[in-house]
């Protein structure tokens, strides 16, 4: 979980270095209501440190808005984003020793996730936490290979996109000083789009062939209950059960769980 921003005073930071820049800010939205924001952005490229010889670049952004209320609980809006690119060029012809020296490749990754979270205290020992979020990811790898007669052949192009929608909710209840239970559900909508083309044999300089291509969607439903019980001052038990249904193949699974923790002395456990 991302931490909340400072709801009493503003704090800002800006850093510049050989690896890039970093910008951060946090502070109150309303001091009276106790709401706050948190923001961070990073841009990094190794070309600043290597004089332009390297092609590794990435940037990421994160934020969180936190809104506590008097009677309706606490609402949070948050998000994360990442773009990562890595490009490798082929070696000069005079330096070719292996097949890899003739290849150039580029890998680009994009990831986004965001959502809204609500936490509500039913009483001093019980709270309900619910979250609705969405995720998106895109990976692409492309590769070219120079031939001995000076041509360039596209030998790899792999694209994979996924986007999911997730809702989860659980109740956390402390029955007494020795027993705490957490029970909840999760619903996940899955979507995918795959395009996979690659040369059957790089060494023979053959063009790409379609290996796999398709798209689809499915859903995963799950429910769980887990308890942490202090059996004694030195022994703690974790007991739980999870059940899951995968709609794509209509498969049900049930997983019971049991764990024991023994702490003979402070800061040492088995």
Residue ranges and their predicted role:
Residues 1-4, 10-55, 60-68, 76-80:
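Predominantly transmembrane beta-strands of Gram-negative outer membrane beta-barrel pores used
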Residues 87, 91-96, 138, 198-199, ...:
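Surface-exposed extracellular loop regions of Gram-negative outer-membrane beta-barrel proteins
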Residues 66-84, 105-250:
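Face-selective signature of the C-terminal outer-membrane beta-barrel domain
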């Amino acid at each position: 979980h991302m931490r909340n921003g400072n709801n009493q005073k503003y704090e800002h930071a800006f850093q510049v270095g050989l690896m890039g820049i970093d910008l951060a800010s946090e502070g109150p939205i309303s001091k009276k209501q106790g709401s706050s924001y948190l923001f961070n952005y990073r841009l990094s490229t190794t070309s600043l440190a290597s004089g332009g010889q390297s092609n590794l670049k990435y940037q990421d952004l994160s934020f969180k808005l936190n809104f506590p209320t008097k009677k309706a609980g606490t609402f949070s809006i948050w998000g994360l984003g990442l773009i990562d690119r890595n490009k490798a060029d082929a070696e000069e012809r005079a330096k070719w020793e292996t097949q890899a020296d003739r290849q150039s490749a580029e890998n680009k990754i994009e990831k986004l996730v965001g959502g809204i979270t609500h936490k509500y205290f039913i009483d001093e020992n019980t709270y309900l936490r619910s979250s609705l979020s969405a995720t998106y990811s895109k990976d692409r790898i492309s590769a070219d290979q120079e031939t001995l007669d000076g041509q360039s052949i596209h030998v790899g192009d792999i694209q994979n996109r996924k986007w999911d929608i997730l809702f989860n909710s659980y109740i956390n209840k402390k029955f007494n000083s020795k027993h705490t239970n957490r029970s909840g559900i999760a619903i996940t909508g899955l979507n995918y789009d795959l395009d996979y083309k690659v040369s059957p044999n790089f060494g023979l300089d053959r063009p790409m062939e379609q290996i796999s291509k398709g798209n689809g969607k499915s859903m995963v439903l799950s429910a769980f209950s887990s308890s942490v019980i202090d059996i004694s001052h030195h022994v703690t038990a974790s007991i739980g059960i999870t059940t899951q249904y995968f709609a794509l193949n209509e498969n049900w699974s049930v997983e019971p769980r049991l764990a024991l923790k023994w702490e003979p002395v402070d800061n040492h456990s088995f």
